[in-house]
Amino acid sequence: MRVYHHIYVYTYILSAVIYSQDLFPSWVVQLSTVKSDIIRPYLIHGNSFLFQILQVLITAPSTRCKFSFQNSIPFIFLALLLSQDFHVFLGIELHAFFVS
C-alpha cells in the first residue's frame, strides 16, 4: 500500500515554481489522478499552458533545489489548474518525481 503526502499548492506558488530558473525543470511530472467529473469542464475549455505543463517531461536535474524523500515514496502532487490569467481554478492530483 502506497502512502502519499499531499500538499495543496496555490497558483501563485505554482507559477513561481514554473518560472523559477531551475526548480521546475528538476521534476518529472506525471498526471496521476483526475477527478474527471469535476475537472473535465475546465479541460474542455482548454488551457494550452496547462497541457504543456502536464505533457512535457522535463528531465534536467537541478543542482540548486533538493527535496527530501521518504524511501522511494512519491513526494509532491497537488497542483492547480491555471486560467489564462493564472488565477486559481481547481486542484488536480499529480505525482512529482525528483530527477536525480
Curated annotation (Swiss-Prot):
UniProt GO cellular component terms: membrane
Assigned keywords, A-Z: Membrane, Transmembrane, Transmembrane helix
Official protein name in the record: Putative uncharacterized protein YOL035C
Subcellular location: Membrane
Signal sequence interval, chain numbering: none
Organism: Saccharomyces cerevisiae (strain ATCC 204508 / S288c) (Baker's yeast)
Transmembrane segments: 9-29, 41-61, 72-92
Protein's UniProt keywords contain Transmembrane: yes
Membrane topology qualifier: Multi-pass membrane protein
Miscellaneous comment text of the record: Partially overlaps YOL036W.
